[in-house]
Amino acid sequence: MRQLEGYLSITPIAIDDTRDLREQVDQLSPGDIALFGTDRLGVPLEYLYIALNPRDDYAEGRRNSINEVGFYDATSYCSGVPLTTQPWAIKPYLTPRAALKDIDTMRDINSLEHPQAIRTFEPRGIIRLENREVAVITDFIQGVRSCDSLIDEYRGETILPEEKARLIARTAFATMHYFHSLEKPYTMNDAQIKNFAFTISTEPWCIDTETFKQTNKDSAKITRFVRDVGSCAYSMSGQYNYDGQRMLSPELIIEYFINQYEESISDLYSYGTVDIVQASIEGLKQDIARGA
């Protein structure tokens, strides 16, 4: 996101009606920031300008995101007077279509009413970059940490402390179970542990929804859900320290992730697909037990 570092100040544009963003995004010029809503801080947007100050330190706990997500302090000014500073995460997308799809996904996730709801970052606006790519602005929330960054902290050790390993496995299970159990379920489609996260209070948090897809559970598509489980288990199993030793034991992955998911199969899937999922999970469990 180094494209934004040269911007000393940007006068934002308002997008009032966000129900159909495609046409409005197409009209943006390179360098435009479009914020969702017509008013910020009681001041019309045309009287504001925004200065972006890079904050790479915000990437702490999100090591794998720093190459694609930029972190900034966005300070709003009116007539040269600073009004407020907000931490932003700004993520570029290859196409406007991908950006708009992800905005819809984030909004849908955050709108769900559920006793175990897992939230994600709230989209606040769009930036048209100089290369014509589109970037999405979201709130940045300190204290959210990706599971792989926790592993990085201990790569110099022989094995990940058991309580940390359990936290990773439980976070992955809780997140996956939640999205697979919804009335209109989501598959993650990139269920590596770098895409699982937790808050400072160790509650699951969703950090990357770009590959999420709402999918029904008919027999033709059931493998997409099973693939999520396998991707996550193999990702946990494939974490090694600097000496080449496995950091999460197969026994722990099976007990705190695979077995937990297996016990919920009858609740997640219909009678006609339970056997398919069960057989796949049994095969996965055998693979992980062998050290795959």
Task: For the regions a language model picked out, list residue spans one by one.
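ATP-binding glycine-rich loop module of kinase domains
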Residues: G42-R107
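Juxta-kinase regulatory segment immediately upstream of eukaryotic protein kinase catalytic domains
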Residues: R2-D57
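Catalytic-loop of the protein kinase fold
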Residues: H180-I193, F198
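Structural motif at the C-terminus of the N-lobe alphaC helix and the adjacent alphaC-beta4 loop
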Residues: T105-I118
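Conserved structural core of kinase catalytic domains
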Residues: I118-I168
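Short C-lobe core helix of eukaryotic-like protein kinase catalytic domains
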Residues: F173-H180
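Protein kinase-like catalytic core scaffold
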Residues: W88, R119, V136, T187, ...
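C-lobe/activation-segment region of protein kinase-like
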Residues: P204-G291
